[in-house]
Amino acid sequence: MTTIVCVRKDGKVAIGGDGQATLGNSVEKGTVRKVRRTYKGKVVTGFAGSTADAFILLELFEKKLELHQGHLVKSAVELAKEWRTERSLRRLEAMMIVADETDFLLISGSGDVIEPEFDVLAIGSGGNYAKSAALALLRTENNLTAVEIVKEALTVAGDIDIYTNHNHIIEEI
């Protein structure tokens, strides 16, 4: 698994993820890029779960973005519908967080599209650790940026979760 976390603060959105890929009980690679920009650099995606499945979903999401001219919510809902109804896609084991400058969403394999109640979303095996750390930092008085909060949340997750490392990729919109 992995950890992907997304934070909105002061009008900025940051998504970050670690770089660890595991196969069974062993680390296969520590520098996988699970966070990437798409749609003319205006949308950032982060994925957790099976890497091959995530790439299939990312490709489908990019097609939806093109079809709907970058409209994040519409593209996410259409992807979730297809994921839920298309028999071959139902077996894919991955989750995604997608964000643009105004919205960010979690897209799950069961067809859920979730907008966060708070300004944090996190997925993957270390997701709950990262979400807790990010929420705590958002609720305290500090001068941390969204990027700094994501970095700290990923560090906490990496300290606790054996499937999350400290090689972070963070993108900000």
Curated annotation (Swiss-Prot):
One GO term describing the cellular component: HslUV protease complex
Cellular compartments annotated: Cytoplasm
Activity regulation, per record: Allosterically activated by HslU binding.
One Pfam family recorded for the sequence: Proteasome
A GO biological-process term: proteolysis involved in protein catabolic process
Positions contributing to Na(+) binding: G158, D161, T164
Protein keywords: Allosteric enzyme, Cytoplasm, Hydrolase, Metal-binding, Protease, Sodium, Threonine protease
EC number, UniProt record: 3.4.25.2
Active site per UniProt: T2
Coarse class of the protein's main subcellular location: cytoplasm
Domain of life of the native organism: Bacteria
Gene Ontology MF, one: threonine-type endopeptidase activity
SUPFAM superfamilies reported in the protein's UniProt record: N-terminal nucleophile aminohydrolases (Ntn hydrolases) (SSF56235)
Catalytic activity: ATP-dependent cleavage of peptide bonds with broad specificity
UniProt similarity note: Belongs to the peptidase T1B family. HslV subfamily.
Quaternary structure note: A double ring-shaped homohexamer of HslV is capped on each side by a ring-shaped HslU homohexamer. The assembly of the HslU/HslV complex is dependent on binding of ATP.
Chain's role: Protease subunit of a proteasome-like degradation complex believed to be a general protein degrading machinery.
Protein's recorded name: ATP-dependent protease subunit HslV
Species annotation: Actinobacillus succinogenes (strain ATCC 55618 / DSM 22257 / CCUG 43843 / 130Z)
Gene assigned in the entry: hslV
